[in-house]
């Protein structure tokens, strides 16, 4: 895609999940994001494409990393960015999500970014508000922007995604990141594995097109990418693991089991990392770790999504301007 060639139109008003996106949809967003990385690596970080537009970040779950990334992405595009502080809002006083949506709609925003602890919250909001909605994570359902930044990290680091073996390891059961990544990586042509104890795997996970392994030794064999997930203890209501120490020994990533992956494999983690729980410090800080690269790619991806949703060629009435 050259600088003077327009990107294909992204044919969706909202980004509510990876499910339902085509290979062309994903490629369009990744190509846009790749162009953004190239620009700001040349210190050309600011654009004015969203000048005069309003972006509202509505986070019902705390996430310094994701919220800061969306805020910086909006500002780099020239948008006016407002962060809603939920602890000080009417929601804490009993206002429903629909009431909040109605109130925000009256402010005439152009983009609303929502993170919520309930699956489907972003979809509900999209039905009640006139602007574009971006899902920044809804319960254990989906986290589409994380999957896109992970795909961009892999593509820029390895040169491709198609044909690579990606091992996603850890708490698959409670992870929206795992769900979105499985869908996106399968669509992009990767071979996806999940590695976890049976207690941390959802029923029917095989139906998502993944190979299932219950030991790191088997699951990491020949892996090009190893993606670790944290234990989401806040979503657990029972005894899913015997102990943290035993979990780390069997399912954490450390030098004793990393030897089974390819020598040039890359290590990824959506953050925040729990050192000594799902990953050893020397691995997280090692030369194969892409954790900080993922953060960098996140800004470029979120810029690309907002650019695509507010592309002036859209009219959202089935025609293109």
From Swiss-Prot:
Superkingdom, taxonomy of origin: Bacteria
Keywords: Pyrimidine biosynthesis, Transferase
GO MF: amino acid binding; aspartate carbamoyltransferase activity
EC number: 2.1.3.2
Matching NCBIfam families: asp_carb_tr, PRK00856.1
Reported function: Catalyzes the condensation of carbamoyl phosphate and aspartate to form carbamoyl aspartate and inorganic phosphate, the committed step in the de novo pyrimidine nucleotide biosynthesis pathway.
PROSITE patterns the UniProt entry points to: CARBAMOYLTRANSFERASE
Positions annotated to bind carbamoyl phosphate: 65-66, 115, 143, 146, 271-272
GO BP, one annotated term: 'de novo' UMP biosynthetic process
Cross-referenced SUPFAM superfamilies: Aspartate/ornithine carbamoyltransferase
Keyword Transferase tagged: yes
Organism annotation: Bartonella bacilliformis (strain ATCC 35685 / KC583 / Herrer 020/F12,63)
Pfam families attached to this UniProt entry: OTCace (PF00185), OTCace_N (PF02729)
Pathway(s) it belongs to: Pyrimidine metabolism; UMP biosynthesis via de novo pathway; (S)-dihydroorotate from bicarbonate: step 2/3
Gene3D superfamilies: Aspartate/ornithine carbamoyltransferase
Family: Belongs to the aspartate/ornithine carbamoyltransferase superfamily. ATCase family.
Assembly, per entry: Heterododecamer (2C3:3R2) of six catalytic PyrB chains organized as two trimers (C3), and six regulatory PyrI chains organized as three dimers (R2).
One term under GO cellular component: cytosol
Chain sites annotated for binding L-aspartate: 93, 176, 230
Catalytic EC class: transferase
UniProt entry tagged with the keyword tRNA-binding: no
Protein name: Aspartate carbamoyltransferase catalytic subunit
InterPro entries named among the record's database cross-references: Asp/Orn_carbamoyltranf_P-bd (IPR006132), Asp/Orn_carbamoylTrfase (IPR006130), Asp/Orn_carbamoylTrfase_sf (IPR036901), Asp_carbamoyltransf (IPR002082), Asp_carbamoyltransf_Asp/Orn-bd (IPR006131)
Annotated catalysed reactions: carbamoyl phosphate + L-aspartate = N-carbamoyl-L-aspartate + phosphate + H(+)
């Amino acid at each position: 895609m050259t600088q003077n060639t327009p990107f294909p139109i992204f044919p969706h008003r909202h980004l509510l999940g990876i499910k339902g996106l085509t290979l062309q949809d994903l490629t369009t967003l990744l190509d846009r994001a790749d162009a953004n990385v190239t620009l700001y690596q040349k210190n050309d970080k600011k654009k004015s494409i969203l000048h005069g537009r309003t972006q509202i970040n509505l986070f019902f779950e705390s996430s310094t990393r994701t919220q800061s990334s969306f805020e910086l992405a909006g500002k780099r595009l020239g948008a006016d960015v407002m962060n809603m502080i939920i602890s000080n809002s009417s929601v804490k006083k009993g206002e429903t999500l629909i009431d909040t949506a109605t109130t925000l709609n009256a402010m005439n925003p152009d983009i609303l970014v929502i993170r919520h602890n309930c699956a489907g919250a972003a979809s509900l909001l999209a039905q009640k508000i006139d602007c574009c909605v971006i899902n920044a994570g809804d319960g254990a359902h989906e986290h589409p922007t994380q999957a896109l930044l992970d795909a961009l990290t892999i593509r820029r680091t390895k040169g491709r995604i198609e044909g690579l073996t990606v091992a996603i390891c850890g708490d698959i059961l409670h992870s929206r990141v795992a769900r979105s990544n499985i869908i996106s990586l399968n669509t992009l042509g990767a071979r996806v594995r999940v590695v976890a104890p049976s207690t941390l795997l959802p029923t029917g996970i095989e139906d998502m097109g993944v190979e299932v392994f219950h030991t790191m030794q088997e699951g990491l064999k020949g892996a090009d990418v190893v993606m670790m997930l944290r234990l989401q203890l806040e979503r657990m209501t029972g005894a899913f693991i015997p102990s943290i120490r035993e979990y780390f020994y069997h399912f954490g990533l450390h030098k004793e089991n990393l030897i089974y992956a390819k020598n040039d494999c890359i290590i990824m983690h959506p953050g925040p990392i729990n050192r000594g729980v799902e990953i050893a410090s020397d691995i997280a800080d090692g030369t194969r770790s892409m954790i900080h690269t993922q953060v960098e790619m996140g800004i470029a991806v979120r810029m690309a999504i907002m650019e695509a949703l507010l592309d002036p060629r859209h009219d959202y009435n089935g025609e293109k301007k």
